[in-house]
Amino acid sequence: MNNYTYNVIVQLEGDSVTAGAAANAFSKHPSDTMVIQYSLTTRKYHVLHGDVTRAQSGKVRWITVGHGDYFGANNPTVYAYKSASEYTEGLNYLKQKVFNNHNPDKLVMLGCELSRGGINENFALKAVVLLGESHTNVPVVAYKREINVANNGQKRIYPTGKYGDSVTTEGYKMIYTYHSETGQVEINNRFAALHFINELRRGELTFAQLIQSSKIDPLRMF
């Protein structure tokens, strides 16, 4: 069930995989969804389908679609070849230029492994903080493994890579919430510090991944 009055799909790249994922996501709620192609580099955009005015009020969900690239080894993950700061700056521009400064009620980042890694690697963690600090305080959904959108609009996760078996998003879908009063982040309703400690215990992270960060102070999360 769709609990939003309108959905905005933002296609960040022009390749066939991204276009296919955007089209499949659109097929889920076609009468209540707009599709906009947007370049984070040039800030140019093109509305393929939908009514911009419906995205300027009400309960709106944004879904950005592009490739996530997770490198590991404490290297920052990129999304559509952009850093978290470039991505969030681009979204804030789009919000002001196209959507009359109307904040979305949720942001879904469709891209591989955007919720994977430690503090320096985790794209979604950085994005939700940067958005919150720029007055776009919105829950952010991201996934910690490779993801595909099927023809029926359903999301499937590939835990061992794109050539392995697929599963549902359960256990791989992470919802990030930024608390502007404290500067802290919750991930799936637990403080980020507890989330990362749990990831360390599960073998998802090394200790070096947990403590190293060039942008975010890990101690602030505690």
Task: Tell me what each language-model feature is.
Residues 106-222:
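Active-site-proximal C-terminal subdomain of hydrolase catalytic domains
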Residues 2, 6-118, 204, 209, ...:
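Catalytic-core segments of thiol-dependent peptidases
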